[in-house]
Amino acid sequence: MVDKRESYTKEDLEASGRGELFGAGGPPLPAGNMLMMDRVVKMTEDGGTYGKGYVEAELDINPDLWFFGCHFIGDPVMPGCLGLDAMWQLVGFYLGWLGGEGKGRALGVGEVKFTGQVLPDAKKVTYRINFKRIIMRKLIMGVADGEVLVDGKVIYTATDLKVGLFKDTNAF
């Protein structure tokens, strides 16, 4: 049985990384430093821009986050690829929330634009994912548009984020 709530805590997301949230076959989130969110604040199956699902999640920012110490020394900024990865993570999390099974893999993105940055003095990053297409057959895949906001301002946009779930990733 899938744990299908509208919101999830950091502890819930960490449980997902251990394979405990969506069952043994469900897609886990990354663990440790690669988990790029502190909570999911909203999930709907029929919401969003396209009426096919919506996810909103948040990451609290503080100057002690691991990436600020190495990217870059003297010019700390959150790597843009981590924001992109967070959006892919949320697409896979949503597929698990719908009952999909398998290991999540990012399959691509149409276009990404960076128009701002996350600096150590920011307070919060918000991720918004609007699903365009969900396939739940032999192929399990989500296609979505996403945006990353820092303290309420949109700084990244991505179109056609694609994530698939695979039972066997050896040939991937």
Swiss-Prot record:
It is found in: Cytoplasm. GO terms for molecular function: (3R)-hydroxyacyl-[acyl-carrier-protein] dehydratase activity; trans-2-decenoyl-acyl-carrier-protein isomerase activity. Pfam families: FabA. Its main location: cytoplasm. The keyword Isomerase applies. It catalyses: a (3R)-hydroxyacyl-[ACP] = a (2E)-enoyl-[ACP] + H2O; (3R)-hydroxydecanoyl-[ACP] = (2E)-decenoyl-[ACP] + H2O; (2E)-decenoyl-[ACP] = (3Z)-decenoyl-[ACP]. The active site is at residue 71. GO terms for cellular component: cytoplasm. Keywords: Cytoplasm, Fatty acid biosynthesis, Fatty acid metabolism, Isomerase, Lipid biosynthesis, Lipid metabolism, Lyase. Its EC number is 4.2.1.59, 5.3.3.14. HAMAP family: FabA. Necessary for the introduction of cis unsaturation into fatty acids. Catalyzes the dehydration of (3R)-3-hydroxydecanoyl-ACP to E-(2)-decenoyl-ACP and then its isomerization to Z-(3)-decenoyl-ACP. Can catalyze the dehydratase reaction for beta-hydroxyacyl-ACPs with saturated chain lengths up to 16:0, being most active on intermediate chain length. Belongs to the thioester dehydratase family. FabA subfamily. Homodimer. This is 3-hydroxydecanoyl-[acyl-carrier-protein] dehydratase. It comes from Yersinia enterocolitica serotype O:8 / biotype 1B (strain NCTC 13174 / 8081).
